[in-house]
Amino acid sequence: MPGLYCPSSWTPLPLTDSWVRACANGPCLSVRARLTYRNPQPQPVDGVFVYPLAEAEVVSGFEAEAAGRRVSFQLQSRRRSQAACCRALGPGLGTPTPRRCAQGHLVLDLAQARSTLVLPTGIIAAAGTMTVTLHSSRELPSRPDGVLHVALPTVLTPLAPPGPPGPPRPPGLCDDSPTSCFGVGSLQEEGLAWEELAAPRDVFSGPARCPAPYTFSFEMLVTGPCLLAGLESPSHALRADAPPHASSAATICVTLAEGHHCDRALEILLHPSEPHQPHLMLEGGSLSSAEYEARVRARRDFQRLQRRDSDGDRQVWFLQRRFHKDILLNPVLALSFCPDLSSKPGHLGTATRELLFLLDSSSVAHKDAIVLAVKSLPPQTLINLAVFGTLVQPLFPESRPCSDDAVQLICESIETLQVPSGPPDVLAALDWAVGQPQHRAYPRQLFLLTAASPMAATTHRTLELMRWHRGTARCFSFGLGPTCHQLLQGLSALSRGQAYFLRPGQRLQPMLVQALRKALEPALSDISVDWFVPDTVEALLTPREIPALYPGDQLLGYCSLFRVDGFRSRPPGGQEPGWQSSGGSVFPSPEEAPSAASPGTEPTGTSEPLGTGTVSAELSSPWAARDSEQSTDALTDPVTDPGPNPSDTAIWRRIFQSSYIREQYVLTHCSASPEPGPGSTGSSESPGSQGPGSPEGSAPLEPPSQQGCRSLAWGEPAGSRSCPLPAPTPAPFKVGALSTEVLGRQHRAALAGRSLSSPPGRANQVPGRPRKPSLGAILDGPSPEPGQQLGQGLDDSGNLLSPAPMDWDMLMEPPFLFTAVPPSGELAPPAVPPQAPRCHVVIRGLCGEQPMCWEVGVGLETLWGPGDGSQPPSPPVREAAWDQALHRLTAASVVRDNEQLALRGGAETTADRGHARRCWLRALQTSKVSSAPSCFTCPVAVDATTREVLPGALQVCSSEPAEPPGTPPASHSHLDAAPLPTVVYSKGLQRGSPAGAWDSDQNGNSKRALGDPATPTEGPRRPPPRPPCRLSMGRRHKLCSPDPGQANNSEGSDHDYLPLVRLQEAPGSFRLDAPFCAAVRISQERLCRASPFAVHRASLSPTSASLPWALLGPGVGQGDSATASCSPSPSSGSEGPGQVDSGRGSDTEASEGAEGLGGTDLRGRTWATAVALAWLEHRCAAAFDEWELTAAKADCWLRAQHLPDGLDLAALKAAARGLFLLLRHWDQNLQLHLLCYSPANV
C-alpha cells in the first residue's frame, strides 16, 4: 500500500489530485506524474514517500514541494557503516512497515530496499498540501501474442471508496455505456465494494488506497517503430486521437473517454501491427558528436594523456573507460523482439530441456508423484536428481539423457530414497544447480520440492543467488508443508517460473504435470545478437546475458553508440590497422590499459574464471579501408552479383580481406564476411585499443558454451552467411563523369563496418553447413555458431575458406575484382559520395534444435547526417518530460551487468578480487550518473536547490550491506565428499546406507553403469530425431468415461495407472509381456486374440486364430503367411510375445519390414502401446491431468512408427478401443461369432 505516509503512526495521507503524462515508445514506458497530498491533521507532520519499483524501473527524478521548500534525492554509495546501527535488529522478513533502529533511522531489509523507493519529504504544515513530482522509466511486459501491457503504478491511481451513487444503469450492455465495448461492467456489476478491498496495512505491497475520491488526469503518447494495430483497456474507456504535432501516423494520443471512478487501476493493452518482428528504436543523446568530442578534449586527464601519447588508439581507449559514465550523452539503440512461440504447437517429441529435481526430506511422502514426473519426460531431455539436507547429494555427476537405463535407475533410486539428515539447505541446493555446466539447446528447468522454512538472512541470500543466475534456469518450486512462501514465490518470480503450494488432502501429481507442461512449452534458446555498426563507431552492448525466451517473453537489448573517428588517426594509403578497439558493457581499468602494440606483435588478454558464467570478450576488426579518397573499388559487388555460381560468394569475401593481398592491390569491396580472418584474443573485460598488430597464430582457448553471455566478436561471427549487409540505394551522381572503376564503389559505405556479437565462445558442431539467406527463415540444419572463435585451427573449425566443399576449377572470377594501385604522383579517381551510415542487427537462436534467424536495420543519418559531410537534420523538439527513457534503461542494464560480475563469482585469487572491485566501481559510477538503482547505492534526500543533504531529514538504511552471496562457487560449495556419491548398478540399487541418499562403492568412487555416459567435453548424447507429435497443451481432451459396469471394480479406480506408467519405456512404448498384462488386468491370451496382427493370433490355437478380426474384412490385420510361420510363439513365463528384442532401436525396426524378430517385437510394442492408451482413456479418464504427458509421449512414439502388415495408425487405435467392447462381451459370456457389429467401426 504505497503512498505518502506519516512515519510516526504510518497512517496514509489522502491524495487529492493525480496528474499523469506517459509516453510508450515500443516496449519502453516513460511516466511523469504530479501527485498532490493533503495533511488533514491539525499539527505539522513529517512525510515519507513510498514508491514500488518494478523490475528494471528507473526513477530519474523526484521532487517534493511543500511551503516553498523543495526536496529531491541523489544516489550515494552504500557504506557498511550505515548499517552498523541496524545490525542489532537482525534481518527482517516481510515486515509490513519499516523498522526503526536505536538512532531513529528507518531500516529496510534487502528485498524491501530493492523493490521500494522510500524517501523522506520533509515537514507538511497543518492542513497544508504537498506536491510530489515523479519521473520514471520502465520496460513493458508482453503477452504471448505480442501485445504490450501498460499498467500504471497503483500509487498514481489508488483505490478509493465509491462516491455518492448515481442513476442506476440498465442490466447488460448498452450503446450509451462507454465501457461496454471493452467488456467492463460497472462497480455494482463487478461487486467491488470498498469494504471488500480492506486489507491489513502494508506499506510495501498491495494496491495503494485513498480514504476519499480524488481527481485524475491522464494522457499517454504512443509511438514506436511500427504502426499500432489497435488498443484496448480492460478497466477504462479510452479515446485515441492524433497529436497536433505528430510527425508520423505511428504516433497517437490516448486519453480517458470518461471520468476515473477511483475503483480500479488503469490498464491499457497495445496491439502492434508487427508484434513478432524485431524492431530498432533510436534515441539521440543530450550532446551531438561534435559537442561530445569537445567535452572530452577539454578534460584535463585527456589533455595529459594526449601530451604523453598522441596515438589515436590510446585516445579511443580513454573514451572506452568513460563509456559507462557517458551513456546519457551519446545516442542509444534499443532492440525489441518478441518471437512468435505461442503459435508453434507443443511438439513433445522435439522438446529439448534439462530438468534438475531437487528433493528434501518432505519429498519422501510423494515418491509416486516424482516417478510419474520422471516417466512423463520425453526421451530427448536431460535429467538429474539431487537430494539435499545439510549436504547436497546428486545422483549423477552431470545430467544424462532420459534413456531406459537412466530412467529405471532414477525410479529405483526414488523408491529407496533416503534424504540426508539435518535441516534442508535450499541455498546449497540452488548453488549446486546453477553451477552445473550448461548444455547447448537444452534450457534448464529446476523443480524444487521442499518444506523448508529458512531464516530471514538465508532467504535473502538465496534470492540474491537466484537473482544473479536467473538467466540460467527457470525454477518451479513446490511447497510441501509449512514452507516459506516468500522464498518460493521469490525464486519463481526471479526465474520466470511458477510456485505451487500443496494443501492438506491435495495430490501433488496434477501440480507436477502442470509444471512439466509449462517447462516443455516452446522456447528460443542459445540466442546471439550480432550488431553491425559503421567503422567510425564504438559500441557498448548490454545486457551481457540473454536468457532463453518462452511464450510471452521479449528480448530487449541496448547499444550505446560512440563516434570515435575524431580521435583515431587514419593511416596513410587507405590501409587500416589489423585491430581496432571495441566496447562492451564492462570496461578495463587504467591499470589494465593495453599499450599500442607494434606491427607484428600479438595482443594478449586474460579470460575470466569459468565458474563466473562469463565468456571472454573478443576484439573487433574493421572490414574495410575507410579512406575513400585513396582506395578504388570494382564494378561488380560479389555480395549482390557473385557470378555464375552464387555459392562462390564466401570465397570472394575471403579474397577481399586485406590480409589476402597486401602490397600490389587494394581491396575493392569489403563486407561483413562469415569467413575467418585474424585470430581473436580473449579478455575478461572489453579490451581497450590494441595497436596495429599481426593477429596470425592467435588461437585462444574456447570458453564453455553459455546461454546468453554477451560480448564482442571479431568481424562477423561464423555462421552469419545468411545475413549479409544490405546495400543501400546509391546516391545519385553523373555516370559519364566517372570512370568504370569508380562506378563499383557505390556499395562500399554500407558494406564497410564492424560486427559486434553476443554471446561468443560457442562451438561449431557442424562446420561448413550452408545456410539459407532468407529473412526470418528457419535454417536447414545446424549451422556454424555465432561468436565462434575465428583463430582456431582447420581441424577445429572445418573448412574455413569455403562454406561447403567445392571445386576450385569451377570458381569463376567476376570482372574488375582487383584494381592496381595508382602510381605515386598520379591522381586518384574522384570519390563517390559516401552512403548514409546504417546499423544492422542479426538475431539467431535455437527453437529445440532448429536454427532460427531474424534481422533488422536502421539508418543513422538522423545522428550524423547522410554521410556526405553535411550536418544531420535538426531533430524535432522533444518534450523534456520523457527524460531519455531508452538511455535510462540502458544505464540500468549496464548497472546490472557489473553487479553480476561483482557479486556472482568468488574471490579466491587477487585477480578475481581486483576484477570484482572494478565491476563494483563501474556499477557505482553508472548508478550515480544515471540515477539507475543499484545494490551498491542508496537514495538520500537532498535540497533541490543546493543539492546538499538535508541535515535533519529522516534517514533510510538497509539492514544488510550489499555483498557477494555467502556461498562459494558451486565447484567448492556444499559437496563435502570428495567423490560424488553414486549408485551400484550391478543388480539394481542396494539399500540406502545411513551416509546418504545414494549408494556408493567401498572406496567412495563413482561407478558409471549407464552405457556410455556423457562427459563434460563431449556434451549430452542425443537420441535420433523423431517426427514431432502434435500435443494440445491448452485444452482438455474429451475422453471415454469408465464403464459403469466396472465402477465398483478395481479397474475403475482413477489413480491406479501408476503400475502401468512404471512399465513405460523411455521412448514412450510398452512391451506386450506378463507385467503389462498384470498392469492392465487383461490376460495375455485375450490381448493376442484381439490383436490386429495375424502373428499374435497365429500364436494361439488354430480355431481361434481368425477370431475376432475375421469379421473386419479382407486386408485388415492379415499379415503374410510366412511372417506368421516364422514368428516364435510366446512362452508361458514372464516374457510376453513382444519380449524378443531388447526394446532399443524401435525407430530402426520399422524399416526392417514385417519379417524377422524386429518386426515381431514392433508388432507387440505397437499393440501394447495402443492398448495402454485405450486403457487410460477407459479406466482413468478422471485423472487425465495426471497421465496426460505420459499418454502424449506414447502417442508420439506410435506416430513415429511404420506399422507392419499394411496397418495404419487409425485402425490400430480402433482395434484397441474395440478391445474393451470385446472385453465386455467376453465378461458376459457371449459368443463372439454371433456379434452383429464390426469392431472397425467402433
UniProtKB/Swiss-Prot annotation:
Residues 354-527 form the VWFA domain. Residues 588-604, 681-700, 1125-1138 have a biased composition (Low complexity). Residues 1-138 form the VIT domain. It comes from the Eukaryota. Residues 605-619 have a biased composition (Polar residues). It holds the Pfam family VIT_2. InterPro entries: VIT (IPR013694), VWA_domain-containing (IPR052627), VWF_A (IPR002035), vWFA_dom_sf (IPR036465). PROSITE patterns: VIT (PS51468). Residues 569-650, 670-726, 751-794, 957-976, 987-1055, 1118-1159 are annotated as: Disordered. This is von Willebrand factor A domain-containing protein 5B2. It comes from Homo sapiens. The lineage of its organism: Eukaryota, Metazoa, Chordata, Craniata, Vertebrata. The gene is VWA5B2.
